[in-house]
Amino acid sequence: MADRNLRDLLAPWVQDAPACALREMILDSRVAAAGDLFVAIVGHKADGRRYIPQAIAQGVAAIVAEADGEAADGTVREMHGVPVVYLSSLNQRLSALAGRFYQQPAEKLQLIGVTGTNGKTTTTQLLAQWSQALGEMSAVMGTVGNGLLGRAIPTENTTGSAVDVQQVLSQLVEQGATFAAMEVSSHGLVQNRVAALPFTAAVFTNLSRDHLDYHGDMESYEAAKWLLFAEHRVGQMIINADDEVGLRWLAKLPDAVAVTMENNLVPGCRGRWLKATQIDYHDNGATIAFDSSWGQGEIESRLMGAFNVSNMLLALATLLSLGYPLDKLVIAGSQLQPVCGRMEVFHAEGKPTVVVDYAHTPDALEKALEAARLHCQGKLWCVFGCGGDRDKGKRPLMGGIAEQLADRVVVTDDNPRSEEPQAIVADILSGLLDAGRVQVIHGRAEAVTSAIMQAQENDVVLVAGKGHEDYQLVGNQRLDYSDRITVARLLGVIA
């Protein structure tokens, strides 16, 4: 492991750095230990250089720290016998630095990056399931966790730090992974967390309102997503042509694969493409007939709703662009399983059908309700809330969407965090034409229970917002709570 030596590690940036052996690469001084390399970056909330004395006291072997300007780039000092190397623009270089430290793990597998507001988790899971069915050892990285397929370990962020990402990829390679599908968040792109990764392919799902508390406006949010295609090493590019932003990007990416279920192909398009020619929705999912640059076929999907047809087609186009055979993909497609907490259906005889979904944006809630309606013979119920300390502007929008598309609406708490639940609910209700038609039940388990107990056998109850999550954030507490387990207990089935 030649690059676990400070001199070798820094060779591209610093001549004759001190030669010392390194154990692990650490960003958090609190977990630094003897032999580690502590990297002191200037973050959004804290200046890591303030914690250099603590890291030294804990026995680190060396430190790489943000330099004060380009003039100090490459400067080497010593503090209490520990070498400190200063690099300018350290945040931008961190992905490359971590890549060298962990022996460039992304070069040793097929790495697929999936970005977009909604559909990232399902698309990455479909890519991993599908490729594994065709012989790969597949892994996922994202919202529901990182790890080999079926063995993902839960994570806090969709895209971890630049060091976390390279470390996880290194672990996956050690475990035998040959294929990894990674969710790439807008935060991760803006903060350079995947800057040095070579993506075999990159997928764009869609763009709608989310994270405006961070990005400020939709233009900045779109620009963040565009970074994956404009400034990263990407082989194949797969773009959803049914999205307004995607259609615009396709005009700038002539070699990208256009994917559509609405026949949104540019007339005279010379690039590669895949389109649905017929979609039949039924109780168990959908039958999807398609045509493409690689040929025609038909897939039986077990996933609910139109947006999952889009996710399926994006995954299919990605694998076709990488050379996987069409006939084998079609056969394996019927075996793909729905994703935990993503339009996950719970059935019990004599009870309403309940669907648990992660939808927590206006667009996602709209699509989830439209999907549930396709499979509903009776009334459509919607139980949802909005998270605290996040974009307040989407709350009335989501209230209006629920009122318009559902027959019965129950507004409840999501993750209120430090906000008053009553204030969040008031924001939601402000978007309704007739707030009197809506039930407000703050306790989430009570709200879910009430909706299911009131609903009839033919009805569908959509429980939206938390999906796979097994906790609720109230104040500074992290409480044990799961929509999936609550629903399963009420219906007498296994979650």
From Swiss-Prot:
The keyword ATP-binding applies. It is found in: Cytoplasm. It comes from the Bacteria. Its EC number is 6.3.2.13. UDP-N-acetyl-alpha-D-muramoyl-L-alanyl-D-glutamate binds at residues 27, 29, 44-46, 157-159, 185, 191, 193. A motif (Meso-diaminopimelate recognition motif) lies at residues 414-417. It holds the Pfam family Mur_ligase. Its main location: cytoplasm. It catalyses: UDP-N-acetyl-alpha-D-muramoyl-L-alanyl-D-glutamate + meso-2,6-diaminopimelate + ATP = UDP-N-acetyl-alpha-D-muramoyl-L-alanyl-gamma-D-glutamyl-meso-2,6-diaminopimelate + ADP + phosphate + H(+). SUPFAM superfamilies: MurD-like peptide ligases, catalytic domain (SSF53623), MurD-like peptide ligases, peptide-binding domain (SSF53244), MurE/MurF N-terminal domain (SSF63418). Pathway: Cell wall biogenesis; peptidoglycan biosynthesis. GO terms for molecular function: ATP binding; magnesium ion binding; UDP-N-acetylmuramoylalanyl-D-glutamate-2,6-diaminopimelate ligase activity. ATP binds at residues 116-122. Its cofactor is Mg(2+). One of its GO terms (cellular component) is cytoplasm. Catalyzes the addition of meso-diaminopimelic acid to the nucleotide precursor UDP-N-acetylmuramoyl-L-alanyl-D-glutamate (UMAG) in the biosynthesis of bacterial cell-wall peptidoglycan. This is UDP-N-acetylmuramoyl-L-alanyl-D-glutamate--2,6-diaminopimelate ligase. The lineage of its organism: Bacteria, Pseudomonadati, Pseudomonadota, Gammaproteobacteria, Enterobacterales.
